[in-house]
Structure formats: C-alpha cells, structure tokens
Amino acid sequence: MTTYSDKGEKPERGRFLHFHSVTFWVGNAKQAASYYCSKLGFEPLAYKGLETGSREVVSHVVKQGQIVFVFSSALNPWNKEMGDHLVKHGDGVKDIAFEVEDCDYIVQKARERGAKIVREPWVEQDKLGKVKFAVLQTYGDTTHTLVEKMNYTGRFLPGFEAPPFMDPQLSKLPSCSLEIIDHIVGNQPDQEMVSASEWYLKNLQFHRFWSVDDTQVHTEYSSLRSVVVANYEESIKMPINEPAPGKKKSQIQEYVDYNGGAGVQHIALKTKDIITAIRHLRERGVEFLAVPSTYYKQLREKLKMAKIRVKENIDILEELKILVDYDEKGYLLQIFTKPMQDRPTLFLEVIQRHNHQGFGAGNFNSLFKAFEEEQDLRGNLTDMEPNGVVSGM
C-alpha cells in the first residue's frame, strides 16, 4: 500500500469543488428511484419528464444529505443511444458530475491534453438562474459532466421541477444518515488501470493519492491492483481497479464481463454513525456482503496490539458485519452491499472515517473471499488458463 504526498502544482484556475451528482441509465427510472428511496433512505428531489416538457428522456432525482442520484430512462422506442447502453451494460452509472469553477478553462486544458470532449460548454437557465455544463469522456462508456453554477438557486438544475409525488411511506421508515459521496470506484479490464488513471492526471490535473498492487491484495484464487486519483483539494477521490492474473476469475473480471467493459463498480457513501445507518438499512431490507466469521476473532486479537482504540463495540460491529481497517493514526469502518441489480456489477459501500484516509486495504483479502463465495454461488468462480483466459468460455 502506498500513499502519495505530492499533489503537484495547484491549478491556477478551474477548481474541482466536489461530486455534484451521479446519473444512472436504467430501464425504468420511476421504479429505480423508488427502490433507492424505500431501501436506502433517499428522498425525491426533482423530476423532468413529459409533464415538464422533456420529450425524450425522463429523470427522477433523489437526495440524501449531500448525495444526489439521478435515474434516467428513454421515453421513446427510437432512442438508440440509451437502448444500446442498457442492452450492453444493464442498469448502471452513465455519468459522474463534478461541480467546478471555470468550466471553460477546464475544458480548454483537457482538450489541449487530448481528452475527448463529448459536448462543448453550454448554458441552461430558468427563472432561478443559469448553469454552465460540459461533458468529457472517461473510461468505458462513462462520462463526466462539469457543472458550473452561475448564481443558480433552484432545487437541482434548470429544467427540473418538484417531484410530482411524495411516497407517504418514506416518512415512516428509519433515517439512514448517509451524508456525502466519499469515493467512486471504476473497474477496468486487465492492463487498463494505468491508462485510465493517467487520464485524470493528464486531463483534469488530478494527482495520485493511494495505491495497492496484487502482491498486497490477493487470495488463493484471485487478486487486484488499484490506484486512487484525487483533485488538488482531495474532495473528489476516484479509485481505479483492474484484475490481476490468478487461478480463478476475480470479482473485477466478473464485473468487466457482465458490464461489457470498464465502468463504475461501486459508490462509497460516508456517514458519521455507521452503526445506526446499517441497522436502519438492514431494517429497510438492504442486503450486505458477509465476511468469514473468523474475521472478528482475528480483529479482536490484532486490536489488542494496536496503537489506536476503536470506540465502537466490536460485538455490535460483528452483529452488523461491519469491517474495521486501521493504522497508527486512526481507523475506518466499512460495509458493502450485494449488487444493486441482477447483473453482478454495481454495488454500494457505507463508510465511516476516524482520522483514516485509506480505502480498507487491510480488509481487501477478507472481502475478496466474501466476493468469491458470492461468485461461486453465481457459477462464476471459474478457472483461468495460463494466458488469463477463462476456461470453457
């Protein structure tokens, strides 16, 4: 595991502020938004569809804390772009939006460095103000929308209105206390992690923040490599994973196979009270990965010799299957959902940090074993040939 302290030069202009929103392209936006509200504690924020004059695409926007998810679907049978995306990838993340300052400058610099500009800067407005946008292409079919608010005071973005319906059940369910997007992870095919991470360093002036390789993260069967890139202020963190060759197909390779290439593997959501959050998410019916039971026995032994003290009761963490990772300065608590759709692609993470800025490297091996058990149930923990090809494919 390597942590990097060199951020490089501070960009003179064009600051990246934070994650603005994540857009999912799904088969049924209404149902997807409802699922995330009832299961995960989001609330309807905004809507765009036929009733608001949007004739091609319908979008339901949901929010929890500062986390904003947009679920979009095609309204017409001739929408080839969204239709093809759905067939290839299934329901999943299409766009990760960043709120920025000086969108024009960021686009100009990215263009000079060779980035593909999907859509040049444009402005949208309504009676509540103006917003400037631009869209860049990153890994796979994923895009980044840059969002520059020009004194905009609306609930979300121009063209969106208040949700047409508020589910009366939502107010009766326990609060989940998820506050902010901590990081968003992209999975790449083998040998594409470096080029995907370099894209951020070159085109967006991000820097390397953290990394692990397959000598540090591996089980008997499979392994991964990961690099985390971040903006100068480190308010946006983007881990990039790739599978490393092993005896069996790794969970990263399984993702790439079912997603039809690179894409967003998981979104980590931060909370200040993970015990209450997970209790309530479990009560709402969210399914989580369970690590082997030996994990907590080993954890108790290791913590006896650790320099830090975990404030939370380990018995409760074990009951809820929350994981702990630590160093000499602090610790983090984390847990991962099972896939959010039938394809074993996108899942979510809930994380709480106590003076610890890592990504749970100490848990990777236990998690990999948990992932492998799930893979085996799906019939996907298959042998790899010496050349890295899955046998029997």
UniProtKB/Swiss-Prot annotation:
Chain positions with Phosphoserine modification: S211, S226, S250
Modified residues (N6-succinyllysine): K132
Enzyme class: oxidoreductase
InterPro entries: 4OHPhenylPyrv_dOase, 4OHPhenylPyrv_dOase_C, 4OHPhenylPyrv_dOase_N, Glyas_Bleomycin-R_OHBP_Dase, Glyas_Fos-R_dOase_dom, VOC
Chief localization: cytoplasm
Modified residues (N-acetylthreonine): T2
Alphabetical GO biological process terms: L-phenylalanine catabolic process; tyrosine catabolic process
Pathway: Amino-acid degradation; L-phenylalanine degradation; acetoacetate and fumarate from L-phenylalanine: step 3/6
Cofactor remark: Binds 1 Fe cation per subunit.
Cofactor (UniProt): Fe cation
Location of the protein in the cell: Cytoplasm; Endoplasmic reticulum membrane; Golgi apparatus membrane
Entry EC number(s): 1.13.11.27
Domain VOC: 18-149, 180-338
Keywords for the protein's UniProt record, in alphabetical order: Acetylation, Cytoplasm, Dioxygenase, Endoplasmic reticulum, Golgi apparatus, Iron, Membrane, Metal-binding, Oxidoreductase, Phenylalanine catabolism, Phosphoprotein, Repeat, Tyrosine catabolism
Gene Ontology molecular function: any one: protein homodimerization activity
Topological relation to the membrane, as annotated: Peripheral membrane protein
Pfam families named among the record's database cross-references: Glyoxalase
Binding sites annotated in the UniProt record for Fe cation: H183, H266, E349
Superkingdom of origin organism: Eukaryota
GO cellular component: endoplasmic reticulum membrane; Golgi membrane
Subunit structure: Homodimer.
Entry similarity comment: Belongs to the 4HPPD family.
UniProt function note: Catalyzes the conversion of 4-hydroxyphenylpyruvic acid to homogentisic acid, one of the steps in tyrosine catabolism.
The protein, known as: 4-hydroxyphenylpyruvate dioxygenase
Source organism per UniProt: Bos taurus
Gene name linked to the record: HPD
